[in-house]
Structures are given as C-alpha cells and as structure tokens.
Amino acid sequence: MGGQIMHKVTLIPGDGIGPEITGATRKIIEATGVKIGWEVVECGEGVKEREGTVCPDYVLDSVKRTGVALKGPMIVPKGGDYVATHWTLNGRAKTPKSYPSVNNTIRRALECGVCLRLADNFPGVPSKYANVHVAIVRELTEDVYIASEYSVGEEYAVALKVITRAASENAARFAFKFAQENGRRKVTAVHKANVLKQSDGLFLEVCREVATHYPEIEFDDRMIDATVAGLVANPEDFDVLVMPNQYGDIVSDLCASMVGGLGMSPGVNIGEHAAVYEATHGAAPDIAGLNVANPTALMLSGVMMLRQLGETQAANLCEQAIHEVLKERVHVTRDLGGTASTSEYTEAIVNKIMKLA
C-alpha cells in the first residue's frame, strides 16, 4: 500500500489523552504500509520535573531535523509561569525568549507562521449544522498572543497587540494559495478594523492587496462579530477564512463544534522549516487513561501529514476508512453517540483500511 521511501517524523505524545490518540493515529498510518521512522520525544507537564522545563531543547532539535511532527495536545495551565528557552533555529540565543505555553513555544521557536484548521461535516456524525466546509487560516506569530503585557499598579493590566505587514502577508498568501490549490471559491478576511483601525486595519489592507494577485478567487471581508454570527446562521456562505491570531484561535473552536465537536477538527502549524500536525482540542486530563477519547481530529491531521509527505494513496485510504466507520456508527466513541473505546474505534478503522487496500 505505502511507498518505499522511509519518512522521518517527530512524534510528540503530549499530555493527558495525548499518548492514547497519538498511538491510535500511528496505528492507522502504519496500517497503510507507509514507512515512517518515528522520533518519539516527550514534552509538556509530564517532563517538567525531570527536565526543568516543559519544552526541552531536544524536542525542538528533533522537529528541526525531521521537518515534520505529529503532536499530541498539551496541558496549558491558566496563569502561571511563561516558558523560557534559549533555543532558536540558528542556535542558542544569549538571552532567552519567553512564551505563554509549550504549544506557543513549539510554534514560534520553529517559526511556524500559519495555522490551518479544517471543519467539515461527516456523514453519521450528529451536528446541528449542515453544509459546513470551512478552512480557517490563522496568523500564528503575533497579535495579543505575543504575550507582551504588564500591570500598572494594582488597578490596570495592559496587553500589546502587534500586527505586521510581513506576517499578515504570509497568512493572506497562504490562504489564497490554499484556495487556489484545493478548488476553493472564496477567501474572507476577518477583522475588527472599524475599531482597531491601525492594527486590524493593516491586516485588512494587506489582505486586499494580496487578493489582487488572485483574481480568480472571490474575496470579501467581515468583522469578527459578524463572522461568528454568520457562521452559526449560514455556514454555507463561508469557505476559506483568514484572520489574526486570537480570532483564529476562537473561530476554529467554534467551527469544530459545528461539525461534531473538537474531536473532529484537524490542523497543522506551517512554517518554512517545519510543519507540526495536531488536533484542535486540548489534553482532557479528566479522561486520560480511560480509553474513551475520540482520536479522529489527530487522525485527520495525520491524513494531512501523509499528503504533505507525498503519500496521497495512503492519505486517501485512511480518510475513506475513517469516513466509512463514522458513517456506519457501529464502532464510534461516546462523544459521537456510540459506546466504542478509543482502541475499538481505532481497530475498526485499521480493519477498514485492510479491506479497502
């Protein structure tokens, strides 16, 4: 089934349900016969005491070396300390950089400038919405998520919102190129430029400029509040959405919830040097080890990864097997209305792959 090329991929199990769903994803990928040399590296809360950090250098070294990672979710404490690292793509910096979470550290240290998340309806998956076929392109390096904030006495807290022309153009070009290469009809820039006239205004200006280079792709723009209202009212009006960092974080979770939940939406963080494939959802430590987690989102991220690796046949095989098992509704996890465990659901997909191959 798979090709003869041995691909090197970094596997980051993650926290909580991470080891279960990365293990499930690995099983279905290997069932296709694709040859992958997995570099398994651990980070997150599980290694903090041993390593003195949630993101050891060897994790970033591995992803830099392989260029591709399949990553489980991480526990991100509310509040608490920032993650400091001297690691950069060009060697160790004299002064460490601080990031708000291990997820943010991996993305920004590896210079992944764009996050792509997909939300699609699946036959057999309960949802209040139909006709959802949305791609969210999220700028990933700036906005208020640069974590530049400070207190002024005890009564004020200030956060800096940064939007640059270069990062905005990178996200916009990615969105239009994705639309062009995947038969998408429209790109919508999402913003709040009526209030944030300088920052979101710059983002919108750049998107408009980039749109002129893709005349075959329809372009429009909407304010963030109108966008979320429109998504829940008429999701079929939307195709590819491009937006600054914080809006993208929120809208991608909304769209995932519209197609069956966070367990159904795959994603990837993409940069010039690396691509990190992950699910939209968190680590869910409350159900860790119970064998009940839905691994579909990460499995679909694995499908995206296979396509990047040039293993199109294997990607299509995994995707078809997932869709058929979901449609049959015999072996689906409890969040989708079934009774199957994570391992039972995974085994059903593996068996389907064997039958389809």
Predicted regions and their residues:
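Short, Lys/Arg-enriched N-terminal segments with co-localized hydrophobic residues
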Residues: 1-5
